[in-house]
């Protein structure tokens, strides 16, 4: 049995061809932080006949099952990435939409200190930093918030 079949079963989902194909696409490095529409277009490019409504439904099921994480970066469009074992935060360019993942133990420690200061037991958090590419290589894009990875 393939790892993807087992992952779906472990999440309590029936193994179906659309779920397997969508999971395969999400595992491609360039398909992290991808919208439902972008995922649908990628499936079409691969010759898969999976409808947009099915893509939305499967992504919602994956989100509920913890297979993917849904992000709402500036611009309002949901993007998805496979859930990972390691925590990371995101830096997002407001002009071109590039998403950079990073981890910083100093930031993590400070967040734990703040939670303790306010007598809150921290269970989870998300940190999104927004800015603009400063190195002159930003490819301003009318479809900002499309991830480049």
From Swiss-Prot:
Sorted UniProt keywords: Cytoplasm, DNA-binding, Iron, Metal-binding, Repressor, Transcription, Transcription regulation, Zinc
Where is this protein found? Cytoplasm
Q: Which family does it belong to?
A: Belongs to the Fur family.
Q: What is the designated name of this protein?
A: Ferric uptake regulation protein
Show the taxonomic lineage. Answer: Bacteria, Pseudomonadati, Pseudomonadota, Gammaproteobacteria, Vibrionales
Binding-site residues for Fe cation, renumbered to this chain: 87, 89, 108, 125
- Any one cellular component term from GO for this entry? cytosol
Q: Where is this region: Dimerization?
A: 85-142
Q: Where is this region: DNA-binding?
A: 1-84
What GO terms describe the biological role, i.e. biological process, of this protein?
A: negative regulation of DNA-templated transcription; negative regulation of siderophore biosynthetic process
One GO molecular function term of this record is: DNA-binding transcription factor activity
Q: Quote the CDD domains the UniProt record gives.
A: Fur_like
Question: Got any disulfides in this one, which pairs?
Answer: none
Altering residue 104 to G: what's the impact? In strain: 775met9
Function of the protein: Fur acts as a repressor, employing Fe(2+) as a cofactor to bind the operator of the iron transport operon. It plays a role in the regulation of expression of the outer membrane protein fatA and synthesis of catechols which are intermediates in the biosynthesis of anguibactin.
Q: Which Gene3D superfamilies match?
A: 3.30.1490.190, Winged helix-like DNA-binding domain superfamily/Winged helix DNA-binding domain
Where Zn(2+) binds, per the record, is at 33, 81, 90, 93, 96, 101
């Amino acid at each position: 049995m393939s790892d993807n079949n087992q992952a779906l079963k472990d999440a309590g989902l029936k193994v179906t061809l659309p779920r397997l194909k969508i999971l395969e696409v999400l595992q491609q490095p360039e398909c992290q932080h991808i919208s439902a529409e972008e995922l649908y277009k990628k499936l079409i490019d691969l010759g898969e006949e999976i409808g947009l409504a099915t893509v939305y439904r499967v992504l919602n099921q994956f989100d509920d099952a913890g297979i993917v994480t849904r992000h709402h970066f500036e611009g309002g469009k949901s993007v998805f990435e496979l859930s990972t074992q390691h925590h990371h935060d995101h830096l997002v360019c407001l002009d071109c939409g590039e998403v950079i993942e990073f981890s910083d133990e100093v930031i993590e420690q400070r967040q734990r200190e703040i939670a303790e200061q306010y007598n809150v037991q921290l269970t989870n958090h998300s940190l999104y930093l927004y800015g603009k590419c400063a190195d002159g290589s930003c490819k301003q894009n009318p479809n900002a918030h499309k991830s480049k990875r």
